[in-house]
Amino acid sequence: MASSSSVSVFDNYRFRTAFNEELYNITVKNKKVISEVCFNLNDDEYPEIREQIALRGWRRLAAPTTEISKMLIHEFYANAIITEEEREEHGGHLYMSFVRGVPVNFSPENIRRVMQFKAEVEGARTNFETRKAHDQQLDNVLAELCMPGATWKLSTGQQRSEIPVIRAILIHCIMKGEDVRAEEIIADKIIRTAQGIKEKGKLGFSSTIYKLCNDAGVPLREFRKTKKIPTETPITARRLESTRLPRNPQH
C-alpha cells in the first residue's frame, strides 16, 4: 500500500520553503512594484540637491536602473519573508533573501557596499533615527521646508501631494547636512514590507534590489522575457517647483 509523504513539494529553485512559495502565489505576485525615482536636474538647477547626492555617495540611488523584471522583485520579497519560528531561532530579522538558487544579502552593510554609499557625512550634527524617535523639531521642519505665508497641517495622509511627517523630517535632515544612513532605512523598509506582505502596499526599492541580486550572482538572464516595472516620472526642476517645495534657506 502506498504511503503519503509529509514532505511538502515545492519549487526549491525559486523559493526557500513551501511557505514562501505559497505566499508568493496567494499574495506577493499580485503586488504592485515601484522603483526609485531618478533625479534629472541640469547643472544650474538646485545645486544644493546635487551637492547632497554627491556628498553622501547617493549617485547610484538617484540614477536607478530601468527595465527591471517585476517577477524578480516579487520573488525577492517572497523569499525575504520569515516565520515567527525563524525569527526566534535567529534572534531577530534575517537580512537575507533568495532568488533562483542564490542567497541575496540585503543587510545595511551590504547595501552600503553595493550602492557605494559613504559611511557617514563629515561634520554631521545629528542622526535621522534620533530625530525621528526623540527630537523631531517639527517647528523647524515646517519653517524651513514649507512656503512662507501658508497655513500648514501635519497629517498622516497618503496622497501623493502630501508629505508624511517622517518623510518631511528625512528631507529636512538631508537638506541640513545631517547624518542619514540610507542603507539602514532601505533594509528596514524591505523587512517591514516583507513581514507585512498581506497588508496593502507596494513593493519598493526595485533598483537597489536589482543591484544586490546582480552583485550576488543571481542569473538575471532568466528574467529577460518577463514583464518589466514601469519607469517612474523623474524629478526635474519643474516638478520640484510645481510641488511648491522651496530651496533650502541660506544661513
Where are the regions a protein language model picked out?
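A structural signal for long, well-ordered, hydrophobic/aromatic- and basic-residue-enriched core segments
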Residues: M1-H251
